[in-house]
Amino acid sequence: MTLEEQQAKEALDGIIKKSRVHLYKPIQIAEILYHDRCIKQLDFLNLDTYRNQSKRWRDEICRRFLGRISTSSAKFQDNLFEKNAIPPEKLAVLGTLNRQSDGGVESYIYKQFFNRFSQMSERLAYVGNTDRYSFQLSEFLNLFWLEPGLKRSIDKIYEIVVYALFDALVSELGITVSIDFPKENLFLWEEYQDFAEKIITMPKNEHLKLPAKIHRVGVTNAADRGLDMWSNFGLAIQVKHLSLDEELAEDIVSSISADRIVIVCKKAEQSVIVSLLTQIGWKSRIQNIVTEDDLISWYEKALRGQYPIAEALLENIKTEIMREFPAVNEANEFLDFAQNRGYDITVTHF
């Protein structure tokens, strides 16, 4: 490889490494290269001729294999083509390499996609192959911490772990939520009853009791700043994993938006994170800080304690992983797709 080609490959590898398991941006690059090679040769240096089209090409693949598309802001999606990512000049070099290798760069990208979801399938198998006696939260978390391809998604795993325990506990406790209104406002209800009853099915005694529910929004992207969990009893929480090996302050400012934020971190980093949160003025927005040790202790109680809630807990984890990473299933058509395009997904270079 020439120096120019090596730099283009390093830029692509950087995008792949930074991507979460869904690999939206690498898939967009692969589809640009595919359309250039097989459908119509592109003018790579003229970004406006393929910038928006390439999002549609990417979305078509993502809907097929992921069941969703990127919901990140247009600005976040477009920074794929900035100088510190894959600018048109480097994309042109990749395009030449891709044509010369008969789709080798495309194969390389989709190999990474296949690897990520193969790794995720193995992690899901851990949940399926363990029970309340053998499941260890520390082992489960390390399956992601120790795998570079999945480490970028560790915040989603923490979110799932927190939600699974919270939801199982609310369900097992049998918590209910009551809705009513003062009798002196009965005249107002009667005035708008035909409309209101279509929204809230209120019984004649003006009192409604519902089972408490926790809902996880899920399926978020790296640039999303929204809610993680909400309930029908007023609770709205964002779970945010923080680590000192990242650009912590920037990560906090760009990611926190909910009124109640639960920070998840390593025990050894807790005091430093609290200090930094205080310095940048975010301490008041933090409802609590949960350490990994806390979660492990709570899971031990939930799985093997005096009053276990293991069945609901483990089922929640499995369900939410399948929901967050829907390509983790035995029926996906990815291998047929790769074969039809002539990809060699055993390729380790191009």
UniProtKB/Swiss-Prot annotation:
Catalytic activity: Endonucleolytic cleavage of DNA to give specific double-stranded fragments with terminal 5'-phosphates
EC number: 3.1.21.4
Tagged with keyword Zinc: no
GO biological process: one example: DNA restriction-modification system
EC primary class: hydrolase
GO molecular function terms noted in the UniProt entry: type II site-specific deoxyribonuclease activity
Pfam assignment, any one: RE_HaeII
UniProt KW keywords: Endonuclease, Hydrolase, Nuclease, Restriction system
Task of the protein: A P subtype restriction enzyme that recognizes the double-stranded sequence 5'-RGCGCY-3'; the cleavage site is unknown.
Name the UniProt record assigns to this protein: Type II restriction enzyme NgoBI
Organism: Neisseria gonorrhoeae
